[in-house]
Amino acid sequence: MSKNNHANHSNHLENHDLDNFSKTGYSNSRLNRHTMYTPEPKLSFDAMTIVGNLNKNNAHKLSEFMSVEPQIRLWDILQTKFKAKALQEKVYIEYDKVKADTWDRRNMRVEFNPNKLTHEEMLWLKQNIIDYMEDDGFTRLDLAFDFEYDLSDYYAMTDKSVKKTIFYGRNGKPETKYFGVRDSDRFIRIYNKKQERKDNADIKIMSEHLWRVEIELKRDMVDYWNDCFNDLHILQPDWKTIERTSDRAMVFMLLNDEEEWGKLERRTKNKYKKLIKEISLIDLTDLMKSTLKANEKQLQKQIDFWQREFRFWK
C-alpha cells in the first residue's frame, strides 16, 4: 500500500447488493440473525509483505550490517542481490536489483508474521531493515479472524462468482474451504486451525475448537483491508423452513453438492443465494464486520507503525 494511497482507502465502498428478485416462499416465522449469541472472534494481521527500493548507498550499508549481525542469516549474496532470514527465521528478506529493473518493480521485499514478533523485534526490524527502503509500501496483508467454535457445519458462500474449493477431513466434514485462487488479489481461506497445528506438531491449543477465516489481500487490494469481504457469508441455513417443496429440494441439493451451482444460470443462482441467506439464523460475517469496525483504529496504527514515524499502538 503506497503512502499516497493510504488516506484514500477508507473512502472505497462497493455496493454488493443482489438483484431484487421476487420473494420465494419460506416459513412465516421470519428469522432474526441477532437472536443467537456468538462470541467475538480474535482479529489480527497474520502476514505482511512490505516492498521498497534500496538505493546503491543504502544497499551497501545494509549489506555490511547484515553480514555481521548475529540475528541475520545471509545467503545467495552478490553485488546486486542477497537473501536473508532474521530474528530466528521469522523474517524473510530479499534484494534483487537486476530482477527489479527487468520487471520494473521495487527491488527489496520483507515478509513476516507480526503475531510472531515481540515489540522489541518489531522495532529492531523497522529501524535496522525497513527504514533503509524508499518508496516502501504493503503488497500483502492477511486479515485473520479466529473463532473458538466449530465452523465445519457452517455454509460459506460469496455473492461474487469465484472459484470455491473444499477439502474434507477424516470425519467427512469440511476442514478447509478456499474462495478464489492463490495468485488473485483476494484469496479467502476458512480452515480448522486447531487441526492444522496438530498436524504440524505446533503449539498445543487448549480450546475445544479453533477455526480461522483468513483473507489474503495482495497488490491494490491491500488498500481496502477494512472493506474486503462484503460479499462473503458464513451461514447456518435451515432448509426445512422453506415451504415450497421445489425450492426446499433445490436448496438442499445446493447445500450438499457444490457442483450443482455450476448448472444454474446467473439469475437463478442469485435467487437461491438470497433464499439461503434468508433462512439462516446467523451470518458470521456480520460479527466479523462489527469486530473489524471495533478494531479498525488499532489495526491502522499497526500499518502506520511500519510506514512512517511512529509510536507503538496501545
Curated annotation (Swiss-Prot):
The lineage of its organism: Bacteria, Bacillati, Bacillota, Bacilli, Bacillales. Belongs to the plasmid replication initiation factor family. Residues 1-10 have a biased composition (Polar residues). The keyword Ubl conjugation does not apply. The gene is repN. Keywords: DNA replication, Plasmid. InterPro entries: REP-like_C, RepD-like_N. Residues 1-25 are annotated as: Disordered. Signal peptide: none annotated. This is Replication initiation protein. Residues 11-20 have a biased composition (Basic and acidic residues). The nicking site of REP proteins is sequence, but not plasmid, specific.
